[in-house]
């Protein structure tokens, strides 16, 4: 069973990220962590039901999980005491990347979520699940998401030195 969360209130924070404090930065990072977890969960459901796209699904699930893990560490550092705030100056400048990553993951989640017709079919006992992407589309998504993961990881490394 999936839990769906309306992230629109969190998007308000994206407009103020350029001058964000630790709590607002953590809220923005939390939004991406939440949506990453949902996308990874949806990918897992597809990997169980759709055998012919397993490799693509696993690749997409791995990169989304990697982004989630990096951002969980960023969030942990952002929520530390005020003594660490000056050290996180690079992380505080990630507003554009955070917003773009959130948008891409939100679009991905929308494409992976069950449609009304699928829900009706499930009620009738028919379990039809079709992977909505070609291998080429997955390759593009993975490449794009890898860039975000690298950006967030590098910012984290700079702030920890």
Region locations from a protein language model:
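Individual transmembrane alpha-helices with interfacial aromatic-anchor signatures
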Residues: 128-140
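N-terminal amphipathic alpha-helical segments
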Residues: 6, 10-93, 108, 112, ...
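Short, well-structured alpha-helical interface segments that form or flank functional binding sites
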Residues: 62, 96, 140
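Intrinsically disordered, low-complexity regulatory regions with latent secondary structure
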Residues: 2-4, 9, 99, 103
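Elongated alpha-helical scaffolds
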Residues: 96-110
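Acidic/serine-rich, low-complexity amphipathic helices located in mid- to C-terminal regulatory regions
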Residues: 100, 104, 138-157
């Amino acid at each position: 069973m999936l839990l769906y969360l309306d992230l629109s209130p969190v998007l308000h924070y994206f407009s103020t990220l350029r001058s964000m404090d630790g709590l607002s930065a953590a809220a923005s990072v939390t939004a991406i962590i939440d949506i990453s977890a949902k996308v990874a969960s949806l990918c897992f459901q597809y990997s169980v039901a759709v055998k012919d796209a397993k490799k693509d699904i696993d690749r997409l699930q791995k990169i989304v999980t990697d982004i989630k893990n990096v951002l969980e560490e960023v969030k942990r550092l952002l929520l530390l005491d005020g003594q660490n705030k000056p050290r996180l100056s690079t992380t505080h400048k990630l507003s554009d990347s955070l917003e773009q990553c959130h948008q891409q993951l939100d679009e991905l989640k929308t494409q992976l979520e069950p449609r009304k017709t699928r829900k009706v079919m499930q009620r009738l006992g028919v379990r039809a699940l079709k992977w909505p992407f070609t291998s080429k589309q997955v390759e593009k998504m993975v490449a794009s998401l890898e860039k975000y993961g690298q950006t967030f990881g590098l910012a984290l490394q700079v702030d920890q030195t």
